[in-house]
């Protein structure tokens, strides 16, 4: 990691406003920030979008969308789950799994190219290109479920997300999400550039 830290330090000396380098350098230095720069997340997934599904599903046998869907359906044995907002919906892998169990499905994501892939799956009633917190601040949050599948590892401090959903959703909607675990208190920025969270 020493060579990488040196490279990003040099990059910041040349371009002090290089936010992506700041984030990676913080991760490599063991410094935990509240959230990554939006441009870092957007560029990361814009670049990943064309091969995202093949990389996760085919190569890594990614199963979290299916597991989350099965858990929700099992704990809510009703004919329809009602309306669902897929936070950080990406290419729509969770949407594919849960579409048949809900009456309305909407998705929001920071990466426009990921949303293009999600649109090709034809499972969402509406897709919105927006930062997650901005969306929660401004849009109607009248949903029965909020799902965030491997999204919060790119958020960090979740307090604002939790607060907005609780205060702006008046229909008692439930939030279901996955995280990567840490034994440290609160949340921690790993060297991978992703965040881990404690209970």
Where are these regions (language model features)?
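A conserved beta-strand element that flanks and buttresses the S-adenosyl-L-methionine
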Residues: 147
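A short glycine-rich, Lys/Arg-flanked "PGG" loop and its adjoining helix->strand segment in the class I
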Residues: 159-171
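Conserved alpha-helix/loop element of class I SAM-dependent methyltransferases that forms part
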Residues: 61-80
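Conserved beta-strand signature within the Rossmann-like core of class I S-adenosyl-L-methionine
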Residues: 172-179
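Class I SAM-dependent methyltransferase SAM/SAH-binding core
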Residues: 85, 91-135
């Amino acid at each position: 990691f020493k060579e990488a830290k040196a490279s990003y330090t040099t990059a910041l000396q040349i371009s002090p406003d290089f936010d992506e380098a700041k984030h990676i350098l913080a991760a490599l230095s063991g410094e935990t920030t509240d959230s990554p720069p939006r441009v870092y997340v957007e560029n990361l997934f814009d670049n990943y979008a064309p091969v995202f599904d093949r990389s996760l599903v085919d190569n890594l046998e990614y199963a979290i969308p299916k597991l989350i869907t099965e858990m929700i359906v099992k704990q809510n044995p009703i004919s329809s789950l009602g309306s669902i907002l897929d936070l950080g919906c990406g290419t729509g892998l969770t949407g594919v799994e849960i579409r048949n169990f809900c009456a309305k499905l909407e998705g929001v994501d920071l990466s426009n190219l990921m949303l293009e892939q999600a649109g090709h799956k034809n499972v969402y009633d509406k897709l919105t290109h927006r930062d997650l917190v901005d969306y929660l601040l401004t849009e109607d949050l009248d949903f029965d479920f909020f799902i965030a599948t491997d999204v919060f590892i790119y958020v960090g401090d979740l307090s604002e997300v939790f607060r907005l959903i609780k205060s702006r959703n008046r229909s008692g909607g439930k939030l279901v999400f996955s995280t990567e675990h840490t034994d440290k208190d609160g949340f921690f920025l790993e060297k991978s550039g992703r965040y881990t969270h404690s209970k």
